[in-house]
Amino acid sequence: MKTIVVYYSLEGNTAYAAEKIAAALGADTLRLQPKKAYPSSGFQKFFWGGKSAVMAEKPALEPYAFRAEDYDCVILGFPVWAGNVTPPIRTFVLDNSLRACRVAAFACESGAGAEKAFHKLVDCAGIDRLRETLILIDPKTKPSEENERRIEAFCAALRG
């Protein structure tokens, strides 16, 4: 099964998890980058990131190489912003039909909102469901055995 992990990461938590998942599954990776970067700290990070997520904005992305037909499974990874999928992931799923792929997702959060974000992702991507989901609490900045166990279980479920 050919797999790719497509993700957006602002502070490194999602990138950390994406690399671990890709290594465990032997998957390709694609890190999405918006043409205009989001602020990475302070009040502006929460204001602009939250506004962009709540308003369902679709930011332009830096060019990337991806063809859905090259993959059996697409894993989407993102930080949760105001209970929403991050805008770069929204842009990606609106620009690329994933209906023929098995789609899974993982979300990194500091508080709550991942379940709500997964439902919005399903709607935005126009798919029936996510094959597997994974919620991590700040996996890079607050490493824990629980996060590691969750990553292992997620990968095992995707292999099976």
Task: Tell me the role of every PLM-derived stretch.
Residues 1-76, 83-85, 90, 94, ...:
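N-terminal beta1-alpha1-beta2 submodule of the flavodoxin-like/Rossmannoid cofactor-binding fold
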Residues 5, 76, 104-107, 132:
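Structural beta-sheet core signal
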Residues 31-34, 106-107, 132-138:
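A generic structural motif
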Residues 38-42, 115-116, 141-143:
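Short, charged, surface-exposed secondary-structure boundary motifs
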Residues 68, 94-101, 124-128:
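Short, conserved loop/helix-junction motifs that constitute active-site signature segments
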Residues 80-83, 109-113, 138-141:
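Short Gly/Pro-enriched loop/turn and capping motifs at secondary-structure junctions
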Residues 116-125:
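Short, aromatic/basic amphipathic alpha-helical patches
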Residues 129-160:
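Glycine-rich phosphate/pyrophosphate-binding loop and the adjoining helix
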